[in-house]
Amino acid sequence: MDLASNLGGKIDKSDVLTAVEKYEQYHVFHGGNEEERKANYTDMVNKYYDLATSFYEYGWGESFHFAQRWKGESLRESIKRHEHFLALQLGIQPGQKVLDVGCGIGGPLREIARFSNSVVTGLNNNEYQITRGKELNRLAGVDKTCNFVKADFMKMPFPENSFDAVYAIEATCHAPDAYGCYKEIYRVLKPGQCFAAYEWCMTDAFDPDNAEHQKIKGEIEIGDGLPDIRLTTKCLEALKQAGFEVIWEKDLAKDSPVPWYLPLDKNHFSLSSFRLTAVGRFITKNMVKILEYIRLAPQGSQRVSNFLEQAAEGLVDGGRREIFTPMYFFLARKPE
């Protein structure tokens, strides 16, 4: 993809720097606080994805998530397998109506629709990502089985009992309130059917009184557009409070033969995911610097690159210390 022309998403190029400054002000390193982020989550998350999506797609591809990974397996292969695993856990059948909550540009929904021969609706509140996702649907020839709806997942525009299955891949972490989000998912899911998710969470090893732990948490929050990273136990409580029966749950990061954060580790090198390596990120950072200098990229692009790099450092440190996971998995059922 053309990184330079897409930087800033739907934000006018002349307004990108102002958007970056406003986004940064939501976060603790720039004087922000959790209450403000939660109160303004729609604005914060939209600014984040307008600013960051082009970087994500350039470095990560169409599926913006981590994955359990086997030795000898490429990052791309592991990402597909991670998506297939979720679809199999849900038991999605051909022709069923499925909802992807917080679908990004639709990489997982296209993969799951093809894998299960189902009809998948992607829910997203970011206009740029939906525009990009529709273009990718057209290029992939899946317009009839994959579609997008622009809406807030805290206030879904669907009738009760609309979907045969619902899933979220590293997306509902953007919700200001887990219970409110899960309750909406419960409402639109048909009775007897299941909801599965990979959640970003702090683990039981996280110590809120440890300054280094809080620094890592803050780095992940600013670099990934998050109001607050919840504990795994809080997600589980919210699920049950929303009415779900939890079939099983587990932090899948614990069983990954290859660390999930390896693609971002500065000590790791891979030709198959070169753009994510330290060398690849260094090249991208300097390319953006040059593009901004010669005005092919909007002012503020370097600062986006900087807070994404800050996120990478926080994710690796959080993964190494086992205080953070991007794959707290659960499968939950709405009672009949």
Curated annotation (Swiss-Prot):
Keyword list, A-Z: Acetylation, Lipid biosynthesis, Lipid metabolism, Methyltransferase, S-adenosyl-L-methionine, Steroid biosynthesis, Steroid metabolism, Sterol biosynthesis, Sterol metabolism, Transferase
Residues found modified as N-acetylmethionine: 1
Pathway given in the UniProt record: Steroid biosynthesis; sterol biosynthesis
EC code(s) of this entry: 2.1.1.41
Catalytic activity: cycloartenol + S-adenosyl-L-methionine = 24-methylenecycloartanol + S-adenosyl-L-homocysteine + H(+)
Any GO MF annotation of the entry: sterol 24-C-methyltransferase activity
GO CC terms of this entry: endoplasmic reticulum; plant-type vacuole; plasmodesma; plastid
InterPro entries, alphabetized: Erg6_SMT_methyltransf (IPR050447), Methyltransf_11 (IPR013216), MeTrfase_SMT (IPR030384), SAM-dependent_MTases_sf (IPR029063), Sterol_MeTrfase_C (IPR013705)
Tissue expression as described in the entry: Highly expressed in vascular tissue, mature leaves and in regions undergoing cellular expansion.
Family named by the database record: Belongs to the class I-like SAM-binding methyltransferase superfamily. Erg6/SMT family.
PANTHER family: HYPOTHETICAL LOC100005854 (PTHR44068:SF1), ZGC:194242 (PTHR44068)
Protein name listed in UniProt: Cycloartenol-C-24-methyltransferase
Species of the source: Arabidopsis thaliana
